[in-house]
Amino acid sequence: MSDDPRQALLQQVEAQRVAFINLQFTDILGMAKTVTLPAGELEDALGHGVWFDGSAIEGFARIVESDMYLVPDLTTYTLIPWDQHEGLATARLICNIHTPDGRPFAGDPRNVLAQVAGQAADLGYDFYVAPEIEFFLFKPDSDGHHAPIPHDHAGYFDVSTDQATLIRRQMVRALQDLGIVVEASHHEVAAGQHEIDLRHTRVIQAADQTVTTRLTVKAIAQLNALYATFMPKPIAGVNGSGMHLHQSLTDRVTGQNAFADPSDPYGLSATARHFIAGLLEHARGMCAVLAPLVNSYKRLVPGFEAPVHISWGRTNRSALVRVPRVTTGRSQSTRVELRCPDPACNPYLAYAVMLAAGLDGIKRKLPLREAAEEDLFHVDPRARGLATLPISLGEALNALRQDELIQQALGPIIYERFLDARQLEWESYRTHVSTWEVSNYLTIF
């Protein structure tokens, strides 16, 4: 095998009988995009990149500045386990986006995350994230159309009554083949709802793995005549799908968990407490990025194990930030869990803003308020002095407009174009007359 990484990859592609290479990136809204090359074109792509029209991608560029090119990240090479035919394989490379002058594109979500991760590195930290990714599996209706029809009627941790357990195992095996470490998978609370938990890893790799998991889940579901959705609240009256994000900082010199202090009642270091304070400080401002859809705010309501109040605690699952217990002697596992994100978010942007918020808490040494351990769904938040998360996408966008730190983390290109895209969605929803309104008002007024 060659010592040159590019030549080594080309040799690997040939040895694995790869016929096609998918070059993958995401748009500002987090949708995966792919350009497929015959394997014979890979050498040129590695040497010179692959040009594309950025004006055709959501939020990327105006027509007058549209030329961009993809630069494959060689460390992301993997075979796609479900896409092999007649002894020939398809592989995938995740790409960074560059402008014609060779610079990283400021509107590339992966680049935005790299910039914020670099700020953490400058402070002496590596940022680790472990997502818990929830989703629904639905079966088509009698006409073969997509409909929110759960494929089973099991509940939390249940052994499903149909093929769901086998399908989850297929998903986990595919993720393992893709090099992703899955810590657990199980049925969630609602019928047809499932969760896959990934092992913590450095933040850019964690975001890559989150996108890959969404694609894998959808592909395996389709192979089983089902469809998977990461829509936060596809069915009224039941739990929605969240993406709880476990996170920690590691000291780059010692390799020790910077959040851990076994002498603290919560096991938290001063660094961890400042980090949590930063998350709480910017919770409203970053909510539009973490919960980016109109539908997201139908999940963030009382009574369905989703956070509403801006608070933290240990046993309290109604809190926005939770500090999970760790086994005695395993302080390296100390972490905090942010519970408002949902799986429809762009993970590159979501992980960037929450890291920026936490680092702001560290830099400013923000004090952490008292923990809230009671069930906040049944208390008056005003009596506790607790603020609440936005109750709509419109309110979340206004909060984003007022949070300069989150705007800076996104950068001016992504901030402006993300805001424009989501504002259009909000205005479309706000002016839409729903079936509920017609059925409740038409014959009465």
Predicted regions located by residue number:
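Glycine-rich, acidic/polar active-site loops that bind/position phosphate-bearing ligands
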Residues: M1-F445
